[in-house]
Amino acid sequence: KDTLESIKDIKEIDEIIVVDDGSSDKTSEVAKSVKSDKINVITQSQNRGKGYALNNGLKEAMKKADIIGFLDGDLGNTASEVEKLITPIINNECDVTIAKFPPAKKKGGLGFVKNLAKESVKEMTGVELTSTLSGQRIFKKEVLEIFDEIPFGYGVEVGMTIDILKNNFKIEEVLVNMTHSETGRDLKGFIHRGKQFYHIKKVVRQKKKEWR
């Protein structure tokens, strides 16, 4: 709710699409309780993962928007920082912006997932980005038109980044003061990172075949 409240009055934003992926946290009800004509809620009957939700929201957004962004729902009040990501696109400085977060407050993983993502993108494109795993991104519509659909799984961001750079679009990382729930060093955190690692490896293997 805080995320929606903090972006609904940003003048550059015409529509906010919320995808309720059949989760148990009452996403639809929360979204509908926010007073704004900009909010459009899409409800899925069952949870089919992040990639599926992104594709659903994207289909809707592509109908009328020139600039499209992805934001996680847990950014809270810091979501208003999205303005910093929108401005370079409007000013035609680049085709895609990626949010670069301040250093994490709590000790997360051992950085191996981040490094794998960073090195994979660099190896395939020659471009070094530090926030390859950040899902907070703004795109010009023509960038998203190169995708039939967004790749599924935790490798989403890495796969997209490789394709975007290979198609000669320009990506700019923008430092933002956003915060969201971080993955800690507990078992759940390690399982999450293990899955990420596996998915990134899989996506990169796939991209190497595609871009031979």
Annotated model-derived regions:
Residues 1, 25-29, 52, 131:
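Residue-level preference for short helical/loop micro-motifs built around acidic side chains
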Residues 1-9:
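Short, well-formed alpha-helical segments that are part of the catalytic scaffolds
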Residues 14-15, 67, 170:
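Residues at the starts of beta-strands that form the adenosine-phosphate
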Residues 14-17, 28-60:
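Conserved donor nucleotide-binding strand/loop of the catalytic core
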Residues 20-29, 75:
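A conserved acidic beta->alpha catalytic loop
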Residues 46-60, 67, 79-154, 181-191:
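Acceptor/aglycone-binding surface of glycosyltransferases and processive sugar-polymer synthases
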Residues 65-76:
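Short beta-strand-to-loop acidic/aromatic patch adjacent to the donor-nucleotide binding site
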Residues 150-212:
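Hydrophobic helical membrane-anchoring modules
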